[in-house]
Each structure stands twice: as structure tokens, then as C-alpha cells.
Amino acid sequence: KILDIGCGRANIISALQKKYKFRNKPIGIDIVANKDVKKNIIFKKIGALQYLKKQEKYDLILIKQTIHFFTKTKLNHLLNLAKKSLNNKGKILIFSLKTKNNKIPCFKKMRKNLEKSLKRDEALFKIIKKNLKEISYTNFNFKVNISKQKYVRMIRERYISCLLNMSNEEIKFGISEIKSKYKNQIKFTDTLKCISYRK
């Protein structure tokens, strides 16, 4: 059984389900119901802490680019509940953006917000290390090749959390900066840091 916390459109667990055809459909939870959520998974619009209190058991719990939404206390609470929700030899995988030399294309204000968020992630990694103790780290590099038009649309839709609190005016100004700064095809390497814990 697989649980994906902060699943968004559920692209990852949907791809896993397509490839491995698990007996139990993976469950994806998120506080936002995305209109494009994949159909081959079970989606629930619910917060992680509330859901994990049900104490169902899982073989794999994914926590993807979600830790920055938690306070330090709530992150500890989340990790404790996640550990309790694992079957024997179950795994927790925590994915987060690489905090050093991040290559995500940004306009000035977006970069400033992102750096602030990544700094906070560094402090949260220490909490994760202290709580889970026996962990291993891996970096996953994704080569991204995206049209400027599509990337601008993603910014408009506030695809990354560092854009969420910006005003429409700031987004508009940022988009014009992106339009003049980048070529029609934007290429970069997106690096995700993965923290792995086994029960």
C-alpha cells in the first residue's frame, strides 16, 4: 500500500501504478483538489495530520515538496504519525528541492522568495534527521526542456509555493521579466533531494 502526501496531480504514484499495477490502488492526499488529478489512484482532499491519525498501515509513504508547509512542531508530529503508519520494513521517502545552487528559472522576487524558503528547508532537514535518525540521502536530477509559453502559464498558475503569496501585479511584472530573460525553450536541471527511512 502506498500513500502520497501532498500528491498534487499525483503524477508520480500514477506512473508507479501504471508500471507495477499494485493490488491496492495508491492513495494520494492533498489539501488542494487539483482538477487534473490522475484517475488511476484514490484521491482524498484532506490534511496529512488528520489523515494519518486514522492509523492505516502502508508499505511506502511519500512526502513530496511539502515539508515547508509545516511548522517545526507539526513536522515532528507528521514524522511520528508516518512512522506509526508504516508496516514492518516499510519506507518513508521525503522529496524536497535541492537547497544549494538551485537552477529553477526565476524572476528577481521569485528567486528571493525561493532562497528564503530553501533556507527554511535546511532547518527542517535537521529536524527530519534528528527524528528519523537512520536515514540515507540521494539526489535525483531531472533534465527539463519546456517552452517559455508553458512556463509563463505555470507561473501564472503559481505552480511553486514561493509564488503563492505574491500579488497579481508582482506575478505580471515577473512574467515580463521571464519573457525578456529567457529564450523560447527553457532548459534547466531540476534537482530533488530524497531522504529515505526504513522501519
In which residue ranges do the predicted regions lie?
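Class I SAM-dependent methyltransferase SAM/SAH-binding core
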Residues: 3, 8-51
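A conserved beta-strand element that flanks and buttresses the S-adenosyl-L-methionine
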Residues: 62
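A short glycine-rich, Lys/Arg-flanked "PGG" loop and its adjoining helix->strand segment in the class I
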Residues: 76-88
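Short alpha-helix
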Residues: 117-131
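Conserved Class I S-adenosyl-L-methionine
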Residues: 136-199
